[in-house]
Amino acid sequence: MITPALRHSGTLSFAIKLTVASTLLTFASLSAHAEEQPASPPQPPDILLGPLFNDVQSVKLFPDQKTFADAVPNSDPLMILADYRMQRNQSGFDLRHFVDVNFTLPKEGEKYVPPEGQSLREHIDGLWPVLTRTTESAGKWDSLLPLPEPYVVPGGRFREVYYWDSYFTMLGLAESDHWDKVADMVANFGYELDSWGHIPNGNRTYYLSRSQPPFFAFMVELLAQHEGDDALKKYLPQLQKEYAYWMEGVENLQPGEQNKRVVKLDDGTVLNRYWDDRDTPRPESWMEDITTAKSNPNRPATEIYRDLRSAAASGWDFSSRWMDDPNQLSTIRTTSIVPVDLNALLYKLEKMLARASKAAGDDANANQYEALASARQKGIETHLWNNQEGWYADYDLKSKKVRNQLTAATLFPLYVNAAAKDRASKVAAATQAHLLQPGGLSTTSVKSGQQWDAPNGWAPLQWVATEGLQNYGQDNVAMDVTWRFLTNVQHTYDREQKLVEKYDVSSTGTGGGGGEYPLQDGFGWTNGVTLKMLDLICPKEKPCDSVPATRPAAPGASQPAPQKQVETTP
């Protein structure tokens, strides 16, 4: 068994000077022990296999490009590549046969058939062991990265753990009283921070060049609900490493400059963006990316590839939010956009670093992190609020102004308690008027055909909206989001006996569409959010296993007439 590398010596701390005039941040790292430096990352399959990888993906040997990215070489990739170069031009060469001989392809997961007559809660509780994986070791050339403890995967084609998905899955594990699994998953992410200096998109070599929305602070906070301040002190070094990754290079930035994930605006405000260290097609979506880049010959392909990868880092892959033309994916420019949700999450990380530092008895660093959080909050209110529209939005580095598009990301400042109260009420009104649909919260109001646009609704965004609105006393709108999404989940489950990755919220009882792959079932984060919402709408003394027939009253709010579930045609 791998021992999690949760080392506590030589931890990272920051000295910060915060001037009132410019809020200039200066970071100085204390020297760290050499053994704590991240290891050299293993190479992804597109580099290991070079032309062989490109050829297999280019002829679309497999319907899903992720299949070959996850295939395991049976011997040294250099030897396989040498054999390929000798054989590929010979008469009668069969590429599929060559792949079958030299690689072990990922197995299709066994089709899970749930027992008949299960309630929604019973179905989810029965899925936890089905979705649990253990990978204490992996083959030398496997793209899968081993983790020390068991973990829960989303389901379907996703055979590995994913960063931001996992927090919402963990919410459900906690509701099911699987605190051991919650602790295991936090330990795994701590191990990744110690191993690689960041939490990758997922535990695959081809995901190491990027991260995902930074929810590690939320995970530690969740674990602390069960273990108390010991969890905060235990994972303080890893929280610091997470922060160092996102802020890398900030100390050398001049106003108007960017470095990887950090940007300094013209007025000296420091904020963050999504970034991938590579500018090549994604191995798991190789031909899709090449096709997208070829459709816009006016842009360098490498620029498009990095923006596609950076959108994958955002979790919103893909959305009109990142595009100049909602109907042309090749106009994507993720790296020139400062996302409101990312900066809200980093505000939370700074607040958690302050809390964990205080728990560890380090008041000086706690005060420094509080100052950083205050500076970021000011930056959010100054640059990520659209005063004309009345909602939080992203900042455009090219036009140097806040964007106009309303997306579900507008609720993240409410979710982390960073919003001004009067602005929170405006966000609630905009949400109700433009994003709230019969089946839940729409991701945007734009119908682009991309999966992170209308009419799709995603479980994590439903929870962010629900909790964010509750934080500011917008209980009726919060209950509307909860009730409508749960009704959607229940109707889909009643018809298909499964929970899915995303839902069409323009009605109830329909899975979502769009994206680079078919609709996936399972599904980790939907399971977790559904359990949280079930426990939100039903009193603790009388928990419900399925969605009640009528909408409950929002706590502490004047309540409209009870609404019955909307009937749908099977």
Swiss-Prot record:
One of its GO terms (molecular function) is alpha,alpha-trehalase activity. InterPro entries: 6-hairpin_glycosidase_sf (IPR008928), 6hp_glycosidase-like_sf (IPR012341), Glyco_hydro_37 (IPR001661), Glyco_hydro_37_CS (IPR018232), Trehalase_periplasmic (IPR023720). GO terms for biological process: cellular hyperosmotic response; trehalose catabolic process. The keyword Hydrolase applies. It comes from the Bacteria. Keywords: Glycosidase, Hydrolase, Periplasm, Signal. It is found in: Periplasm. Its main location: periplasm. One of its GO terms (cellular component) is periplasmic space. Belongs to the glycosyl hydrolase 37 family. NCBIfam families: PRK13270.1 (NF009773), PRK13271.1 (NF009774). Monomer. This is Periplasmic trehalase.
